[in-house]
Amino acid sequence: MQENYKAKAYDILKNLNIEEGDLIEIKKGDLRIRGVLLPSYSKDERIFVIKLDNGYNIGISIDNISEIKLITKNSSKAQESERKEVSRNGAKSEIKIISTGGTIVSKVEYETGAVRPALTTEEIVQFLPEINEIAKVDAEVLFSILSENMKPEYWVKIAESVKKAFDEGNTGVVIAHGTDTMAYTASALAFSLRSLQGPVVLVGSQRSSDRPSSDSAINLLSAVTTAKYAPFGEVVVNMHADSSDTYALVHRGVKVRKMHSSRRDAFQSVNDKPLAKVLWKERKLVMLDKSYMSKKGETTLDAKFDNRAFLLYYYPGLDRDFLEHILTNTKIRGLIIAGTGLGHTSSDYVELFRKATKDGIFIGMTTQCLFGRVNMNVYTTGRQLLDAGVTPLEDMLPEVALVKLMWVLAHEQDLEKIRSLMISNLVGEINPRHTLDLFPRWSYE
């Protein structure tokens, strides 16, 4: 277990029979430092990495250390042995954990302070022995990228890995993913994987796993709980529900959005209720919405995407020539508009849209408001856009509509068939009924 340490640091640990995960005390001058020895990812071979009681990780140079004392051995050795056995044989696992990168599998680079996607899912499991109390897991690192670098071709690889995991006998899948584009991937998987045998749970964290305020551990424990106990066969996002560590929420993958840049409870269901909440301390899943897709017998895979689609966020003063260039001088096959209010753009673009739809380009309308649905029959401009061939997309989120369009374009060439699929509720991306409690209200009392 000292394999992450090299040269002199390795020799010191080996001679004292100290391994990663052991509680140790280091004396350096008048300073005594007690904490758990962590793996070192430092390029400096003379650094020990210690997790303190307050949750912070520190690097300590071996120079001028007068004493290193072993306090207690790692208590999770037996569980670790079981984890290794499970990892060697995926058929023994119940839940597959697929790592794609992101903050939940990131480490701080102590030379620079930067966060890098270097921690594998297996290493997270090593520091979360509680996972074995929930289910037997098997970990796989599919790739290690930051979520802003996600691409449609990666969605295909993730979908294929999920299908393989179910074919191997797993009853649920957890996908560790960066939070910034998690909703895009969740949508892509929802359209690509049908008749799911069990839940597919995307999970991430807003703060890396070596920070004292990290949400990594709770989110991952909650995700495995969801994958183990959920009665549904759907793609979902499992994240913190509040700014403390009370519980997590499970959101339908095509009705969720990251609504804050840094808060741990950044994810919120939009135009829909969360499917469930997870009481992570009790390892308990509480269903909040019974209108879910049940588990099926065999998962089907249909992961194809055509990225000749464009998401346009309309704004006053949008240059007409720029829009015309997109519609006439590129290879675009479809345009999703995030319009104002009930689904509008300036009437200046109506004839551009009319020509584009006549040329076979699909144009769909969503709302920048996010909450609520488009209704283009209310005002004159909306009716003009309808007449020009713009298709209203109900209460679909703009990003979901974009991913859906990419999936539809890969399956259909005919514009009317594309329209038909885009307005069809395939995986719960359209909620036909809105109630008052779907809109969040902020109280200032």
From Swiss-Prot:
Record carries keyword Protein biosynthesis: yes
PROSITE patterns referenced in this protein's UniProt entry, alphabetically: ASN_GLN_ASE_2, ASN_GLN_ASE_3
Similarity remark: Belongs to the asparaginase 1 family. GatD subfamily.
SUPFAM superfamilies the record matches: GatD N-terminal domain-like, Glutaminase/Asparaginase
GN (gene name): gatD
PANTHER family: 60 KDA LYSOPHOSPHOLIPASE, L-ASPARAGINASE
InterPro entries reported in the protein's UniProt record: AsnA_fam, Asp/glu_Ase-like_sf, Asparaginase/glutaminase-like, Asparaginase/glutaminase_AS2, Asparaginase_C, GatD, GatD_N, GatD_N_sf
Record protein name field: Glutamyl-tRNA(Gln) amidotransferase subunit D
Pfam families: Asparaginase (PF00710), Asparaginase_C (PF17763), GatD_N (PF18195)
Organism: Saccharolobus islandicus (strain M.16.27)
Protein function: Allows the formation of correctly charged Gln-tRNA(Gln) through the transamidation of misacylated Glu-tRNA(Gln) in organisms which lack glutaminyl-tRNA synthetase. The reaction takes place in the presence of glutamine and ATP through an activated gamma-phospho-Glu-tRNA(Gln). The GatDE system is specific for glutamate and does not act on aspartate.
Active site: T103, T179, D180, K258
Keyword Glycoprotein: no
Keywords per UniProt: ATP-binding, Ligase, Nucleotide-binding, Protein biosynthesis
Gene Ontology MF term list: asparaginase activity; ATP binding; glutaminyl-tRNA synthase (glutamine-hydrolyzing) activity
A GO biological process held by the record: amino acid metabolic process
Domain Asparaginase/glutaminase: 93-425
Subunit structure and binding partners: Heterodimer of GatD and GatE.
Catalytic activity: L-glutamyl-tRNA(Gln) + L-glutamine + ATP + H2O = L-glutaminyl-tRNA(Gln) + L-glutamate + ADP + phosphate + H(+)
Listed EC numbers: 6.3.5.-
Broad EC category: ligase
